[in-house]
C-alpha cells in the first residue's frame, strides 16, 4: 500500500471539516445578528423570529455535520485503500 494515501486522507479529512464549517459559521452569525435586529425592531414578534431562527440554525448546522461524516469516512472507512 502506498503510504501517501493515508496521509492524503488525513489532510483531506481536516480540509473537509474545516471548509464545511466556514459557510455555516458565517451563515449562523449573520442569521443570529439579523434575528437580534428583528427582535429589537419588533419585540412582539420575538417568538416567531426565535422559532424561525432555531429551525434555520439546525439546517445550517447539518452542513457541518455532513462534512464531519465525510471526514470520518475518509479516516476510518477509507475508500481509497
UniProtKB/Swiss-Prot annotation:
Xref: HAMAP family: ATP_synth_c_bact
UniProt name for this protein: ATP synthase subunit c, chloroplastic
Pfam families, alphabetized: ATP-synt_C
Transmembrane as UniProt keyword: yes
CDD domains xref list: ATP-synt_Fo_c_ATPH
Family recorded in the similarity comment: Belongs to the ATPase C chain family.
Membrane topology annotation: Multi-pass membrane protein
MF annotations from Gene Ontology: lipid binding; proton-transporting ATP synthase activity, rotational mechanism
Natural source organism: Cycas taitungensis (Prince sago)
Function: F(1)F(0) ATP synthase produces ATP from ADP in the presence of a proton or sodium gradient. F-type ATPases consist of two structural domains, F(1) containing the extramembraneous catalytic core and F(0) containing the membrane proton channel, linked together by a central stalk and a peripheral stalk. During catalysis, ATP synthesis in the catalytic domain of F(1) is coupled via a rotary mechanism of the central stalk subunits to proton translocation. Key component of the F(0) channel; it plays a direct role in translocation across the membrane. A homomeric c-ring of between 10-14 subunits forms the central stalk rotor element with the F(1) delta and epsilon subunits.
NCBIfam families linked to this entry: ATP_synt_c, PRK07354.1
Record text on subunit structure and interactions: F-type ATPases have 2 components, F(1) - the catalytic core - and F(0) - the membrane proton channel. F(1) has five subunits: alpha(3), beta(3), gamma(1), delta(1), epsilon(1). F(0) has four main subunits: a(1), b(1), b'(1) and c(10-14). The alpha and beta chains form an alternating ring which encloses part of the gamma chain. F(1) is attached to F(0) by a central stalk formed by the gamma and epsilon chains, while a peripheral stalk is formed by the delta, b and b' chains.
Amino acid at each position: 500500500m502506498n503510504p501517501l494515501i493515508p496521509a492524503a486522507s488525513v489532510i483531506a479529512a481536516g480540509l473537509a471539516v474545516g471548509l464545511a464549517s466556514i459557510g455555516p459559521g458565517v451563515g449562523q452569525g449573520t442569521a443570529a445578528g439579523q434575528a437580534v435586529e428583528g427582535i429589537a425592531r419588533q419585540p412582539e414578534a420575538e417568538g416567531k423570529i426565535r422559532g424561525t431562527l432555531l429551525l434555520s440554525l439546525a439546517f445550517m448546522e447539518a452542513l457541518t455535520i455532513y462534512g464531519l461524516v465525510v471526514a470520518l469516512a475518509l479516516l476510518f472507512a477509507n475508500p481509497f485503500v
